[in-house]
Amino acid sequence: MVRSVKCIRLGCEAEGLDFPPYPGELGKRIFDNVSKEAWSQWIKHQTMLVNEMRLNLADIKARKYLASQMEAYFFGEGADQPAGYIPPDK
């Protein structure tokens, strides 16, 4: 049976994640409030941040930065955009 959540990012009922994608309280909040589709969108955004900002994931500061951006993306004002980023036309 598919688990459904009221996705905080998409603003609608959608298929939920199969397991918490991140440890701790933040992972539980994401599991309870974020859909698979929104999580997939975050992964793409996170990849863009890592590549454009040249983050080294072995560096604890980079991992903490991504965790704070993930929280902002889902529960705050939104995550950072790389300098000069222009969204694609839809």
From Swiss-Prot:
Function: Could be a mediator in iron transactions between iron acquisition and iron-requiring processes, such as synthesis and/or repair of Fe-S clusters in biosynthetic enzymes.
Keyword Secreted: no
Annotated coiled-coil segments of the chain: none
Database matches in HAMAP family: Fe_traffic_YggX (MF_00686)
Keyword list, A-Z: Iron
Family as reported in the entry's similarity comment: Belongs to the Fe(2+)-trafficking protein family.
Pfam families listed in its UniProt record: Iron_traffic
Annotated GO biological process: cellular response to oxidative stress
Highest taxon listed in the record's lineage: Bacteria
GO cellular component, one term: cytosol
Source species of the chain: Nitrosomonas europaea (strain ATCC 19718 / CIP 103999 / KCTC 2705 / NBRC 14298)
InterPro entries xrefs: Fe_traffick_prot_YggX, Fe_traffick_prot_YggX_sf
UniProt-recorded Gene Ontology molecular function terms: iron ion binding
Annotated protein name in UniProt: Probable Fe(2+)-trafficking protein
UniProt lineage: Bacteria, Pseudomonadati, Pseudomonadota, Betaproteobacteria, Nitrosomonadales
